[in-house]
Amino acid sequence: MPSSQALNHSIPHALNLLGEVAMRKWISLVSVAALGDSVADSLLRLPLLRAMFCELIGLKVGMIREATELFLLGLLSVMDALLNLPMAVVLQEITVGDDIKKALLGRSSRYRPIFGVVLDYESGTREQLEESCRHCGLHENFLPDLYLQSVRWISDILAEVPVTA
């Protein structure tokens, strides 16, 4: 079997063996470990924080089936900065759904309101945050707890990354 066919077979096989939750955790760990010391700490934490925050907001507003895609949206949200390429170029090189692409490019999509809440919460723009929360049907009083859950999740993930000397 050619290597590309083997890879196409091995990824779904790994997903079946590990399960989605374990695979997501593994991908998060590999991503963090692979970046190493050359990338600022904020660029290590930010995609993980956004990923979990997007997922938790989605779950809170009833987008249970979309949780994995919302996680991916957050994870990919800083790939342009990590790769030093425009987001449009990054998105040409990977296969993701249109809703994720549109949200990352600032266009209207099912996921853009949730991503907007995340960005507005980070930037502290109160009026815009209120509008974003209204748009996705979320009461903003839930955000500090969801954010804290995301931060705790990152701490747990990073605690599992072996320290190399």
Regions found by a protein language model. Name each.
Residues M1-A165:
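Conserved alpha-helical "signature site"
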